[in-house]
Design a protein with these regions (language model features):
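Acidic/histidine-rich
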Residues: 355-356, 360-433
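Histidine/acidic-residue-rich, glycine-tolerant segments that coordinate divalent metal ions
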Residues: 95-97, 117-119, 128-138, 144-145, ...
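Polybasic, lysine-rich low-complexity intrinsically disordered segments
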Residues: 2, 13-16, 20
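Conserved small/polar residues in nucleotide/adenosyl-binding loops
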Residues: 437-439
């Protein structure tokens, strides 16, 4: 990890860095304001209502990665109306955009995600599973809130800088395809963050707490096996089964698991099993693999081992194999200084105060969800277990929790990691889920 990014709070920091820290402090407050009842007290009632309607609009669109055309148009149009200079089609991605306001330093990038997932269609405000007819996608982890919350933060910072006649540039970055596609990796690759002093993001969660530590590096690819078709009963000796090769590859990878690091993961899914006729030797088969490890070099080494297994499977079956790279994500480099600044802001603003009606609304959803008494609490939380237990037994988290700066790797991946390799980056989580979910 690049330890130069970990600026100690007690050290001598040049003026521009102090401005960056202050600006970050303000920006983090802005995000949290949106979570209070009725929206932000800084924004007008009209603005708050418009933001509320925008998140409903994004929920309704629920567009998957790189296809978020309606969502991106709605968000970029909103930014234009609020006085931001908007540029669309960043780094060859149709649905990537940035809204810029201000001038001079510091330059802070606020990251916004807005893509949805397949298989998660759901009507809004319904506590039971009820997919929308004719719709396959839905927002599974609150990206409709994520994007709109980031816009609200940018608006509040703009208002503050205008009223106080202060220098500084805010960039509200619309980042497509976080769930699958790694939109931020393309932005980082093409130097989009070259002039940025810091990047801040947030994510809906079960808790109000600053995020710390790393996330896994990962590589996603397709293994396409090509064989020879024949009649499986009358002429089996002439066939070379691509499906056999895919299955043997999976067997080999499963034997590999014993000889991997305990924090490494390999997942797979059959995307083409060769057809639906068992009496025909399958000439084509495809498997999608996702390889994860704690750092980029370790992930690359594990990926190469998986490739060798695929080659062996092809050799055993007399088939050939094409390896088609799909996407890759870097591990997250945490920035402990920004984390501490974010936490100071979090505690100054405090958690939202929920009304009884809001708590009753949350309870409707909790009553449909089985309580898991074995649910583990992430190591990033620096609070007594008794306090965490009380939160898990409530409907929604209504306090801010102290976090622990940890140099550990969480299980999971995000393209925020690619941003963290090129600019100091930090993240907060705010309670938008039930307390017992995904802690």
């Amino acid at each position: 990890m690049n330890r130069q990014l970990f600026l100690p709070l007690g050290s001598e920091i040049e003026k521009s860095n102090l401005e960056t820290v202050f600006f970050t402090f303000l920006l983090s407050q802005s995000i949290i304001f949106l979570m209070s009842e009725g929206g932000s007290t800084v924004l007008s009632k009209t603005q708050n209502q418009a933001l509320y309607e925008l998140q409903k609009e994004l929920w309704g669109y629920a567009e998957p990665g790189f296809l978020e055309h309606k969502s991106a148009k709605a968000m970029s149009g909103f930014l234009r109306r609020e006085g931001f200079q908007v540029t669309e089609g960043l780094c060859g991605m149709d649905t990537a955009f940035v809204g810029v306001w201000g001038s001079g330093r510091p330059v802070i990038c606020l990251l916004a995600e807005f893509d949805a997932l397949y298989g998660l269609s759901q009507e809004a405000d319904v506590a039971e599973y009820k997919p929308i007819e004719g719709m396959a996608t839905g927002h599974g982890c609150g990206h409709h809130l994520l994007g709109v919350g980031s816009i609200a933060a940018a608006m509040i910072v703009k208002d503050y800088l205008e009223k106080n006649k202060l220098p500084g540039t805010i960039k509200m970055v619309g980042c497509p395809a976080e769930e699958s596609g790694s939109g931020k990796a393309y932005l980082a690759r093409d130097g989009f963050f070259a002039d940025a002093d810091a990047a801040i993001t947030w994510h809906p969660s079960a808790l109000n707490v600053v995020s710390s530590g790393s996330h896994q590096s990962c590589i996603q690819c397709y293994f396409r096996f090509h064989g020879v078709s024949s009649h499986a009963a009358g002429n089996p000796e002439a066939g070379r089964s691509a499906l056999d090769a895919a299955e043997l590859m999976s067997v080999g990878v499963n034997y590999l698991r014993e000889h991997m690091d305990s924090k490494e993961r390999v997942h797979y899914a059959y995307t083409n099993a060769g057809g639906i006729s068992p009496n025909v030797v399958q000439a084509e088969a495809e498997v999608k693999y996702l390889v994860r490890s704690t750092t980029n070099p370790k992930c690359q080494k594990l990926y190469e081992r998986v490739i060798n297994i695929a080659k062996g499977a092809a050799l055993m079956t007399g088939t050939t194999c094409d390896v088609v790279f799909d996407e890759g994500l870097s591990n997250v480099i945490p920035n402990f200084t920004l984390e501490q600044v974010l936490e100071e802001a979090f505690f100054e603003v405090g958690a939202p105060e929920y009304t009884e009606a809001e708590r009753a609304y949350a309870k409707q959803f909790r009553d449909t969800y089985p309580l898991d008494p074995e649910s583990e609490v992430t190591a990033v939380i620096a609070e007594p277990k008794t306090l965490i237990a009380n939160i898990q037994n409530s409907d929604i988290c209504d306090i801010v929790l102290r976090h622990r700066c940890v140099d550990e790797c969480s299980m999971g991946s995000t393209d925020v990691g690619d941003v963290s390799w090129v600019v100091p980056t930090a993240q907060i989580n705010t309670a938008c889920y039930l307390s017992l979910i995904h802690i």
